[in-house]
UniProtKB/Swiss-Prot annotation:
Pathway: Cofactor biosynthesis; adenosylcobalamin biosynthesis. The active site is at C331, H430. GO terms for biological process: cobalamin biosynthetic process. Residues 250-438 form the GATase cobBQ-type domain. This is Cobyric acid synthase. It comes from Herminiimonas arsenicoxydans. GO terms for molecular function: ABC-type vitamin B12 transporter activity; catalytic activity.
Length: 486
């Protein structure tokens, strides 16, 4: 059957209802059928981002959905990306390029301009592809944000597309979520909602069926599919830091998690490694004995450094290094390992200079220009020539004696730094563990002698196929609906 919708939007009753996964699953299914399908999210708010081939920045969810559709990620797939830098402000990225930081009130006033960028990207995609699958953000029931909405029903109304509403039954209250969401919508918004998807169901479906019939009677709209709870998926998480681990080995790696952690998917390969015990440490928790400590990236490096010190972790890191432990710093974590971080132009807040951990002989100056690039190179440590691939997203330049001992060689240039005793390694390279050869080399450098290589791309592909198979009933139900009338 032919897919009847040139554009279809997936909205959720709550955050984390399954919108991203559902769009990815439908992208994979339609691509397998030869449909030229493309994912699209008008506005995304996330610290976990991806770099496109042309050096732009989009939400990692849209990069995953692009992979599901068999496409290279493109900035038109996510024209507006908001990267929170504080509780009330965010960096605004339009068409892949950072514009400036705005507080919530200023951005709300800016939304009509942002909508123009959204519609420009949507217009290009809809002209190039047969089907555009759109992901909403959060919930359309945020009545306080309805004015100037560009992420949910505001966009659907602007392009006149149908909407399906997904709700997570695993968290409870699924019928109230759906009925309550519909009650918050306008008459035209309710009319364009063509059906519901119940996500993450586990149990006896016969016990759910009376509730489904009641829901359909109350709303006059069909339940298009009930999708199962799928365990053990290896898909890029975008919002909350993933705490679960598919394997737990003897080699302990500890990651202190600051408030503004960015690109936590850097650790996905370690989470899946059978010889690794990956532990993410939150506020108030002491850093336990470890073979390797990794300082992650940060959207507010100086602020997160202050928070790390106030949490008592500086002493633990220095003690770990003193007794021969290995430390890796990635992006903002790399900057923290140095002597100072200067922000003369107030890129991250008030201008000033912060004293770093002084574990690497480098100094960093933050600059407004953002480095965005997909990169390929070689490891430059431990007498290895292992290949490495990843991406850079950072604002600032790090220099110093430790840079004469680089971590990697990227396109012929040295990248990153190592301490003179080779205990500390820092780099701007995100995704360094995703290349199996580089992951093995880094773990050997840290003290784990293992031949195991985790292929994250293969695990991701297998998970995309799993979610696509589970979503087949939804696709069948959608194909059975009447196409929209002009």
């Amino acid at each position: 059957m032919k897919f009847p919708f040139p554009t279809l939007m997936v909205q959720g009753t709550t955050s984390d209802a399954g919108k991203t996964t559902l769009v990815a699953a439908l992208c994979r299914l339609l691509a397998q059928q030869g449909v030229r399908v493309v994912p699209f999210k008008p506005q995304n708010m996330a610290l976990n981002s991806a770099v496109t081939a042309d050096g732009g920045e989009i939400g990692r969810a849209q990069a995953l959905q692009a992979v599901a559709a068999g496409l290279p990620p493109h900035t038109d797939m996510n024209p507006i990306l908001l990267k929170p830098s504080s509780d009330t402000g965010a960096q605004v990225i339009i068409h892949g390029r950072a514009r400036n930081d705005m507080n919530a009130r200023d951005y709300h006033a800016y939304k009509p301009i942002a909508m123009q960028a959204v519609l420009e990207s949507y217009g290009r995609l809809s002209a190039q592809y047969e089907t555009v699958l759109v992901e909403g953000a959060g919930s359309p029931a945020e009545v306080n944000l309805r004015d100037r909405d560009i992420a949910n029903m505001g966009f659907a109304e602007a392009v006149d597309c149908p909407v399906i509403l997904v709700a997570d039954i695993d968290r409870g209250g699924v019928f109230a979520h759906i009925i309550g969401t519909l009650a918050c919508l306008s008459e035209s918004e309710r009319k364009r909602t063509i059906g519901f998807v119940i996500n993450r169901f586990r149990g006896d479906i016969s016990l759910l069926e009376p509730g489904l019939r009641w829901l359909e009677e109350q709303t006059g709209k069909p339940v298009l599919a009930v999708l199962p709870y799928l365990h053990g998926l290896f898909l890029d998480a975008e919002d909350a830091v993933e705490q679960t681990q598919t394997a737990r080995g003897a080699f302990r790696i500890v990651v202190p998690v600051p408030p503004r952690i960015s690109n936590h998917t850097d650790f996905d390969a370690l989470r899946a490694h059978p010889d690794v015990d990956l532990q993410l440490i939150g506020p108030g928790q002491p850093i336990p004995a470890a073979d390797l400590i990794i300082l992650p990236g940060s959207k507010n490096t100086r602020g997160d450094l202050d928070w790390l010190i106030a949490n008592g972790w500086r002493e633990a890191l220095i003690r770990h290094a003193r007794y021969g432990g290995k430390i890796i710093g990635i992006c903002g974590g790399y900057q923290m390992l140095g002597k100072t971080i200067a922000d003369p132009q107030g890129v991250e807040g008030l201008p000033g200079i912060s004293q770093g951990l002084a574990l690497l002989d480098i100094t960093t100056v933050l600059t407004p220009e953002k480095q965005l690039e997909q990169v390929h190179g070689m490891c430059a440590f431990a007498d290895t020539d292992a290949a490495v691939s990843g991406y850079e997203i950072h604002m600032g330049l790090s220099e110093g004696e430790a840079c004469s001992h680089p971590a990697f060689v990227i396109a012929g240039r040295p990248e990153g730094a190592r301490s003179a005793d080779d205990q500390i390694l820092g780099s701007y390279l995100h995704g360094m563990f995703d290349t199996p050869s580089a992951c093995s080399a880094l773990l050997r450098w840290a003290g784990l002698d293992s031949d195991v290589a985790v292929d994250t791309a293969r695990l991701r592909e297998a998970s995309l196929d799993r979610i696509a198979q589970a979503a087949q009933p939804l696709l069948d139900a959608l194909c059975a609906l009447d196409p929209p009338t002009a």
